[in-house]
């Protein structure tokens, strides 16, 4: 599987981020073609210190080529363009050809 991880830095207004993300951004992401799995959540820490990032999302595809086609599609472009509407802290995107080490 090919994984795209989007790391969202801490936004200026967390409540506005949460509202826009759940009501507007998630529906756009759900329209991206070829996504096999979409997982997201707010970051936490084991020691109680503030996490280094606010939230992250992971999109899984069969291959790197599928991921590229999905993000180049109109639906992928719409979702990417929407990020500027709520992610005031910025984002980092990570791309991984995932290998399962343990079942």
Curated annotation (Swiss-Prot):
Superkingdom of origin organism: Bacteria
Domain EthD: residue ranges: 12-88
Disulfide bond positions: none
Coiled coil spans: none
GO MF, one example: oxidoreductase activity
InterPro entries linked: Dimeric_a/b-barrel (IPR011008), EthD_dom (IPR009799)
Cited SUPFAM superfamilies: Dimeric alpha+beta barrel
Protein name, per record: Uncharacterized 11.0 kDa protein in thcB-thcC intergenic region
Organism: Rhodococcus erythropolis (Arthrobacter picolinophilus)
